[in-house]
């Protein structure tokens, strides 16, 4: 019976993670709220690593063609200086640059963030900040394509991503808001945001991989962890495909409304 409880618990958290990871409402913030509201305390170090791995796998699957093209053209430009591969080569460079702020800040301030910025009230405030950003860009229509990006764009989007280390600040929301304020087209902003998720997530996995071996609950929670992984992967795939359609229709304001409602309710009642 206890094992069934754990399976159900991690199934719920996995579905929750998968649903909220791609869309701009902060998956980390919602996990904090879900644990608080449902009284679900996560045992062990490996859960966040596990569900992030599942979300990463779903993103890799969806953007596989972009990744293949970027890799092919990036190598082509390095070895042949092919002019038609130049924009993809620099797109990769800008992704690397944009990864740096979150990586540096995450390493230096992880303990501080975990101790002081993961409270329920902080999540409420951060969701309201996310809502404001999404509202500001609701009608923006930029002109920048992949080939029009600059180092300045990469640095600013990278700094925006670093802000999302705070639960309640959506990673996809922060990066898309920054990208669109810099004049990127919606599809360019979306692609840059989720391709940027890949190196950041991989870096986090590499830094945390030893947590699995140290997890004292791994034997007990092996099956629930697998259930959470599968649930997160499937839900992330579905949620990201849905979000891509929402972006294409320019309906980001609905996510802003949602973040306002949840943020206000969190501050009042939790």
From Swiss-Prot:
It is a multi-pass membrane protein. InterPro entries: UppP. It is found in: Cell membrane. Keywords: Antibiotic resistance, Cell membrane, Cell shape, Cell wall biogenesis/degradation, Hydrolase, Membrane, Peptidoglycan synthesis, Transmembrane, Transmembrane helix. Its EC number is 3.6.1.27. GO terms for molecular function: undecaprenyl-diphosphatase activity. One of its GO terms (biological process) is peptidoglycan biosynthetic process. It catalyses: di-trans,octa-cis-undecaprenyl diphosphate + H2O = di-trans,octa-cis-undecaprenyl phosphate + phosphate + H(+). It comes from the Bacteria. The chain crosses the membrane at residues 5-25, 42-62, 89-109, 117-137, 192-212, 220-240, 250-270. GO terms for cellular component: plasma membrane. Bacitracin is thought to be involved in the inhibition of peptidoglycan synthesis by sequestering undecaprenyl diphosphate, thereby reducing the pool of lipid carrier available. Belongs to the UppP family. Catalyzes the dephosphorylation of undecaprenyl diphosphate (UPP). Confers resistance to bacitracin. This is Undecaprenyl-diphosphatase 2. The lineage of its organism: Bacteria, Bacillati, Bacillota, Bacilli, Bacillales.
């Amino acid at each position: 019976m206890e094992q069934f409880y754990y399976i159900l618990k991690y199934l719920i958290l996995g579905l929750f993670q998968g649903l909220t990871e791609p869309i701009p409402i902060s998956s980390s913030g919602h996990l904090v709220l879900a644990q608080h509201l449902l009284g679900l305390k996560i045992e062990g170090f490996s859960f966040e690593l596990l569900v992030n791995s599942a979300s990463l796998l779903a993103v890799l699957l969806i953007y596989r063609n972009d990744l293949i093209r970027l890799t092919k053209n990036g190598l082509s430009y390095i070895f042949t200086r092919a002019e038609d591969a130049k924009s993809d080569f620099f797109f990769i460079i800008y992704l690397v640059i944009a990864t740096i702020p979150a990586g540096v800040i995450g390493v230096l301030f992880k303990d501080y963030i975990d101790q002081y910025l993961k409270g329920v009230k902080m999540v409420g405030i951060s969701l309201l900040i996310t809502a404001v950003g999404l509202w500001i860009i609701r009608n923006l229509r930029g002109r920048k394509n992949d080939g029009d990006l600059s180092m300045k764009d990469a640095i600013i989007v990278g700094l925006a991503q670093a802000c999302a280390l705070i639960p309640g600040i959506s990673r996809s929301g922060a990066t898309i808001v920054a990208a669109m304020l810099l004049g990127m087209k919606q599809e360019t902003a979306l692609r840059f945001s989720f391709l940027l998720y890949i190196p950041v997530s991989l870096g986090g996995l590499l830094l945390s991989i030893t947590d699995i071996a140290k997890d004292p609950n791994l034997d007990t929670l092996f099956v629930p962890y697998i259930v959470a992984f599968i649930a997160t992967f499937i839900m992330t795939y579905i949620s990201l495909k849905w979000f891509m359609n929402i972006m294409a229709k320019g309906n980001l304001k609905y996510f802003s409304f949602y973040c306002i409602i949840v943020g206000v309710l969190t501050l009042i009642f939790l």
